[in-house]
Each structure stands twice: as C-alpha cells, then as structure tokens.
Regions:
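Surface-exposed amphipathic alpha-helical segments
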Residues: 49, 175-208
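Conserved polar/disulfide-associated segments of primarily extracytoplasmic proteins
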Residues: 57-165
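Proline-anchored loop/turn motifs at beta-strand termini and strand-loop-strand connectors
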Residues: 37-59
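Bacterial N-terminal signal peptides
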Residues: 13-23
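Bacterial N-terminal signal peptides that target proteins for export
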Residues: 2-13
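A short, structured loop/turn motif at beta-sheet edges
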Residues: 139-147, 170-173, 207-208
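A short, solvent-exposed beta-edge/loop patch
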Residues: 163-177
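Sec/Tat signal peptide C-region and signal peptidase I cleavage site
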Residues: 24-28
Length: 208
C-alpha cells in the first residue's frame, strides 16, 4: 500500500512565509467557516487567513502577490491530492487538507476498531512514506464525533526539515489528512498544538 501525500513547491512555501512576515492582509473570507471545494468538508479558520483551494482562479491576485505561477500551484494541488492550503498569521501555521483513497484490501472499520488498532494501522501507512518520521500517535475524538489518529510528524520538503502535527481520519475508502505545519520549520509549541487540535475539532463532514 503506497499512500501519496501532498508535496509543496519550495517557491510557494517561501512565499507563504514571506506573507506572514509582511503581514499581508486579506485574501480570506469574512466568515471563519471555510467550505473546501472538491471534498465534503468545512473548517473553521481565523478571518484574515490566506487560503488557496483548487477553485482559486488561476489569475487571482493572490498569486501575483505571492509572485508564483498560479497554474503551476493549482496543478501541484491536483497532482498531489491537496484540496486546501491555508496560512494563519496568528499563530504562524500552515494548514493543508489532503484526501487519498485506500486500496480495497487495506480498509479498516474505523469507527469500531480499538484505539491501538487505529494507531497501528496509521503507523503502517507512515512506514511506507519516504522522508517522514511519525511519533506520539494517539486517538482523538472531536465534539463532532469524528475519530482521528493524531501524530507528530518530522518530514522533509525540498530539503527543508518540517515539523507538523497531523490528524488523520477515514470515511469509507477515503483517508483525510489535516496537517498543521510550523511555518518556519521550528518545532510546534504547546499553544500551537492546541490550535491545531481546535481546527481539527471544528472539522465537519457535509456529505458522504
């Protein structure tokens, strides 16, 4: 079973970090509820977040502000199963939402399995990924009744070490990865872990 996770271009990651440092305002919605095109998911993110989805127009001014090729970024999102890329200014975190499909022989009864079984299943996924180290796997149940496996992730993106906290859940044959990434490559601090949990806790499914 080979699971492909989203990869970013170095240019986009650098541009997003620059936006935080420069306090670029505004390409986010006024409402803090974000409907993610292409997947039946809504998230609550702070107003003022910078948000990219697959439906961001290729000629949107956001790409000019970031000084990146909008067509290339959107192609990258589609190629790598990435449905949302959002940057928060306070705290300085990047959030991504990825959905991939599991092979039919790798399905698990997510709702009825024991916590240890869920962690073991997710750890088996991580073992097959390159440049990824996961630890501190645990199960988190949100107020929405969604069960997640939560893990701390040490990875590499274009030769740069990244630290993140990832929440994984499965619905049917679909795996959803919600990842909160330290924007500057530093280890997440306690308040940032709490914030990632808050965002995961606000995730809602609006359909099957």
């Amino acid at each position: 079973m080979k699971i492909r996770l989203a990869k970013h271009t170095r240019a986009l990651a650098a541009a997003l970090a620059f936006c935080v440092l420069s306090a670029v305002p505004a390409y986010a919605q006024e409402d803090d509820t974000v409907e993610v095109p292409g997947v039946p998911v809504t998230l609550s993110l702070p107003a003022g977040s910078l948000i990219l989805t697959r439906e961001t127009p290729v000629d949107d001014a956001i790409f000019e502000t970031l000084n990146v090729d909008g067509a290339a970024i959107l192609e990258n999102m589609n190629k790598n199963d990435l449905y949302l890329d959002a940057v928060l200014f306070k705290p300085p975190l990047e959030f991504t939402l990825v959905r991939v499909q599991l092979p039919s022989n790798s399905l698990i009864d997510w709702e009825n399995s024991e916590d240890a079984q869920l962690c073991a299943f997710v750890e088996s996924i991580y073992e097959q990924l390159d440049n990824i180290t996961a630890d501190d796997c645990s199960v988190y149940s949100s107020e929405q009744g969604i069960r997640f496996v939560r893990a701390n992730i040490l990875g590499s993106r274009d030769g740069i070490t990244t630290h993140s906290c990832q929440y994984i859940t499965i619905r049917g044959a679909d795996v959803y990865y919600l990842t909160g990434i330290a924007l500057y490559g530093d280890t997440l601090i306690s308040s940032e872990y709490d914030f990632v949990e808050k965002v995961a806790g606000g995730l809602r499914f609006t359909g099957p």
